[in-house]
C-alpha cells in the first residue's frame, strides 16, 4: 500500500495530468484515507468505509486518466468499466457482479507478479544450476545412475562465469521444460462468462503441465527455467488469499458513463439497463459478498469512482440511494487553449515529445517551436468550440493531421530537419480550422 501524503500524490499526478486540481485533491485524500484506515485497531477499521467519488465533467478532461494514474501510484487492483455494459439480471448484458470477478482476476495477476519478483533471485540461481547440468552432465556410475555433482568443481565454475557474462547465450542445449497444455476455448453465451471460465480452468487442471525435452538457445532456456522455478517457489493458495485481501482493502473500481444509465424525464415501460442497472450497482457499492472462482469477496471497503459528462442528465437524476453512496462530488472544468498548450509540453512523455522520439527512429529531426505549439493548441480549442467538444483527445487528431506528410515521407527524408512553427501549422491546418464543415469530417 502506498504511504504517500496527499501533497505527494497530487504532485505525482501533476506530472501526467494538467489542471483539475479539485479532482486530484479528492482522489489524493481518498487514497491517503486507505492508509489511515489500515493504521486503526481492527474493531474500528471494520467500521470505516471509503467515501466514494462522483466525477462530473465533459469528455477528454482527465477523469479516466486521474483514476488510472491513482491506481498505479497505489499499486492497487484497478478496473475501469462502462456503466452502459451492465443491465438488470434477466436481460441481455453483463451482470454487475462480473465487475468484482474481473477485479479479482486483476488482483490475482498483480499479486502473482509481485510474488514472482520476490523469488526471482532464488529462481535465477536454480535455473542457472539446471543449465550447467545440461552443459556438464554429471558422470554416471556402473548402474547408470547419475553421481553426486560437484557444485564447486573448477570446470563448473569456469562455465558459470561464462554463463553470467553472456558468452554462452547463443549456444544450444537440450533441457526438459514444462509445456502447458492447449486450453479448450469455449464461446460464452451472454451472462454465462463465469461458468465458461470455470469449465476452462477445469479442463486445464485435468490436462496439467507435461515435461518435454526441447532444444533451445541458453538465453531462451534461462528465461523459461526462471519462470518454471519461480512458479514452484510460489504458494498458489497463499497467493489467492493475499489477492482477495488486496481486492477487499485496496481495490478501486472506476465506473464510466454513469450518466448514461440515468432515467431521463418521464419514461413509461420497462427501462432496461437504466434504473434497473443502478439498483444492481447499489449492493456492490454499499457492501455485499460476491462469489468468484478464487473465493468470496466482500465489497465493503472497495473504493468506487463514478464519472459522467452529465450533459443531458443531471446527478440528481440518479436514484437517491445511489446518490447517497457517492458522497464526494467533484466537478472537472473544460480545458482552455492555455491548458492545451501545457498538455503538449509539460506532462512526462508529452505528445510533442512522443512525435519527436518516433521521428528520430527514422533519423528525422523534428522541432516544435513555442509559437507552433501555441498555434496547435489554439487550433484544437477552436475546433472543439465550433464542433463537438472532445477535450484533450482533439490534440491527437490535430497532431496526426499536422504530422501526416512528415510521417509518410520520413523514410526518404532521413537526415533532414523539420521545424514546426506557427507558419507551418497555419499552412497545414488553417483552411480546415476555418471551414466548419471540413472540421467536422477531418478534425
From Swiss-Prot:
A molecular function (GO) held by this record is:
peptidase activity
Recorded hits in SUPFAM superfamilies, A to Z, give: P-loop containing nucleoside triphosphate hydrolases
Per UniProt, the keywords (alphabetical) are: ATP-binding, Chaperone, Cytoplasm, Nucleotide-binding
According to its UniProt record, where is this protein located?
Answer: Cytoplasm
Q: GO terms for biological process? A: protein unfolding; proteolysis involved in protein catabolic process
Tell me, in one coarse class, where this protein mainly resides. Answer: cytoplasm
- This protein's source sits in the domain of life called Bacteria
Its Gene Ontology cellular component terms are: HslUV protease complex
Which CDD domains does the entry link to?
Answer: RecA-like_HslU
By its UniProt entry, which InterPro entries does this protein fall under?
Answer: AAA+_ATPase, ATP-dep_Clp_protease_ClpX, ATPase_AAA_core, Clp_ATPase_C, HslU, P-loop_NTPase
The residues the record assigns to binding ATP are 18, 60-65, 256, 321, 393
Assembly, in brief, is: A double ring-shaped homohexamer of HslV is capped on each side by a ring-shaped HslU homohexamer. The assembly of the HslU/HslV complex is dependent on binding of ATP.
**Family assignment from sequence similarity:** Belongs to the ClpX chaperone family. HslU subfamily.
Recorded hits in NCBIfam families, A to Z, give: hslU, PRK05201.1
Function description: ATPase subunit of a proteasome-like degradation complex; this subunit has chaperone activity. The binding of ATP and its subsequent hydrolysis by HslU are essential for unfolding of protein substrates subsequently hydrolyzed by HslV. HslU recognizes the N-terminal part of its protein substrates and unfolds these before they are guided to HslV for hydrolysis.
Q: What is this protein called?
A: ATP-dependent protease ATPase subunit HslU
Q: What organism is the protein native to?
A: Vibrio cholerae serotype O1 (strain M66-2)
Amino acid at each position: 500500500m502506498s504511504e504517500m501524503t496527499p501533497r505527494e500524490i497530487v504532485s505525482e499526478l501533476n506530472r501526467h495530468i494538467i489542471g483539475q486540481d479539485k479532482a486530484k485533491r479528492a482522489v489524493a485524500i481518498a487514497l491517503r484515507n486507505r492508509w489511515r484506515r489500515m493504521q486503526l485497531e481492527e474493531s474500528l477499521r471494520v467500521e470505516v468505509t471509503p467515501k466514494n467519488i462522483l466525477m462530473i465533467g465533459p469528455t477528454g478532461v482527465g477523469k479516466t486518466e486521474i483514476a488510472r494514474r491513482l491506481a498505479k501510484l497505489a499499486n492497487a487492483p484497478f478496473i475501469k468499466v462502462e456503466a452502459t455494459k451492465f443491465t438488470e439480471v434477466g436481460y441481455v448484458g453483463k451482470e454487475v457482479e462480473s465487475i468484482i470477478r474481473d477485479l479479482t482476476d486483476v488482483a490475482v495477476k498483480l499479486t502473482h507478479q509481485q510474488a514472482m519478483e520476490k523469488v526471482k533471485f532464488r529462481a535465477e540461481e536454480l535455473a542457472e544450476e539446471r543449465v550447467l547440468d545440461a552443459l556438464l552432465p554429471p558422470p554416471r556410475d556402473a548402474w547408470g545412475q547419475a553421481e553426486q555433482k560437484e557444485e564447486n568443481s573448477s570446470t563448473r565454475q569456469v562455465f558459470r562465469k561464462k554463463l553470467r557474462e553472456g558468452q554462452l547465450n547463443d549456444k544450444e542445449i537440450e533441457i526438459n521444460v514444462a509445456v502447458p497444455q492447449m486450453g479448450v476455448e469455449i464461446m460464452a453465451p451472454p451472462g454465462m462468462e463465469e461458468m465458461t471460465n470455470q469449465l476452462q480452468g477445469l479442463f486445464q487442471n485435468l490436462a496439467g503441465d507435461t515435461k518435454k525435452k526441447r532444444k533451445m538457445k541458453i538465453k531462451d532456456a534461462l528465461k523459461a527455467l526462471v519462470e518454471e522455478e519461480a512458479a514452484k517457489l510460489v504458494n498458489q493458495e497463499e497467493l489467492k488469499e493475499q489477492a482477495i485481501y488486496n481486492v477487499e482493502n485496496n481495490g478501486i473500481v472506476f465506473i464510466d458513463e454513469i450518466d448514461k444509465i440515468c432515467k431521463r424525464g418521464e419514461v413509461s415501460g420497462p427501462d432496461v439497463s437504466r434504473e434497473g442497472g443502478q439498483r444492481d450497482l447499489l449492493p456492490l457499492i454499499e457492501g455485499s459478498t460476491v462469489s468468484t472462482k478464487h473465493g468470496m469477496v466482500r465489497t465493503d471497503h472497495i473504493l468506487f469512482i463514478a464519472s459522467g459528462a452529465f450533459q443531458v442528465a443531471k446527478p440528481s437524476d440518479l436514484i437517491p440511494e445511489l446518490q447517497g453512496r457517492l458522497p464526494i462530488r467533484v466537478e472537472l472544468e473544460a480545458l482552455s487553449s492555455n491548458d492545451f498548450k501545457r498538455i503538449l509540453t509539460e506532462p512526462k512523455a508529452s505528445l510533442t515529445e512522443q512525435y519527436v522520439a518516433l521521428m528520430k527512429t527514422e533519423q528525422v529531426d523534428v522541432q516544435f517551436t513555442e509559437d507552433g505549439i501555441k498555434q496547435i493548441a489554439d487550433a484544437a480549442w477552436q475546433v472543439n468550440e465550433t464542433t463537438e467538444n472532445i477535450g484533450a483527445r482533439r490534440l491527437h487528431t490535430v497532431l496526426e493531421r499536422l504530422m501526416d506528410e512528415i510521417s509518410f515521407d520520413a523514410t526518404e527524408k532521413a537526415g533532414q530537419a523539420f521545424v514546426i512553427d506557427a507558419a507551418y501549422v497555419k499552412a497545414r491546418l488553417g483552411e480546415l480550422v476555418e471551414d466548419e464543415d471540413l472540421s467536422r469530417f477531418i478534425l
